[in-house]
Design a protein with these regions (language model features):
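N-terminal Sec signal peptide cleavage junction
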Residues: 2-4
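Conserved structural scaffold segments of CAZyme catalytic domains across common CAZy folds
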Residues: 7-130, 134-140
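Aromatic- and carboxylate-enriched substrate-binding clefts and catalytic-loop regions
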Residues: 82-222
């Protein structure tokens, strides 16, 4: 969860001289926080479109309105206070991080729904937004976006560069995602900026996936 500013989601995005998490109590271990969040996910609707090969998968503002009303009227009283995105729709942003989610028409050139719009709709019903994302992923629209806290280091420079990056376990494989190469300059600031971005926006939960892919290039089922 990123609903606590205990970690380094401040305006100081300089490289840390020491690990900022040392000595902190994880939020999940804090009093009265020993439970998993209860939320409704867009996964089912988008996964069905994937199975039907009805591309691009979309979840429109009207879909959000219907889902939000359903959760508010039927699930909120049972503790469900959040709706969460998934990975089966477009994820983009011009500042290096996700600010838009899902096209609005079955057309890759159609507008996308602004996360800020979704958050406003949720707030009006006393609900929260969670996102499916990872600081290891790059899904920007503008590769020249400057990483906050750096001296003009661009987001695009964090990608794998075959001319410089030689210690690669599977050099002939194609990436299913754009991954951050963590020893590139600016990677730490990008990671800290990732959590600050969502914290500032009002996102309250981040679902992360496929971390094992980053470690060794393999899925846990392989």
């Amino acid at each position: 969860s990123c609903n606590s500013n205990e970690w380094d989601v401040t305006s100081d995005l300089n490289v840390d001289s020491v690990d900022p998490t040392i000595g902190l109590t994880p939020l999940a271990e804090a009093p009265h926080m020993d439970y998993a969040p209860l939320y409704w996910s867009v996964y089912g609707a988008l996964r069905q479109q994937e199975k039907d090969a009805s591309f691009p998968n979309i979840f429109t503002e009207t879909d959000w309105d219907n889902a939000i009303n359903y959760v508010a009227n039927n699930l909120k009283s049972h503790g469900y206070d959040m709706l969460v995105t998934d990975g089966f729709a477009s994820m983009s942003g011009d500042n290096g991080y996700m600010t838009r989610y899902s096209h609005t028409l079955k057309n890759d050139n159609s507008p996308e729904v602004q996360l800020s719009t979704i958050i406003s709709k949720l707030n009006a019903k006393g609900l929260k937004l969670g996102v499916y994302d990872s600081p290891f992923w790059l899904h920007y629209t503008n590769p020249n976006a400057i990483i906050p806290g750096t001296d003009n280091i661009t987001v695009g420079s964090l990608r794998y560069d075959s001319k410089k990056d030689k210690d690669i376990k599977h050099p002939t494989k194609n990436d299913q995602f754009g991954w951050v190469v963590t020893d590139h300059p600016g990677a730490e600031q990008y990671f800290e900026g990732f959590f600050k971005h969502y914290s500032d926006m009002g996102v309250k939960f981040i679902r992360m996936d496929f971390l094992s892919w980053y470690e060794d290039g393999m899925n846990y089922t392989d």
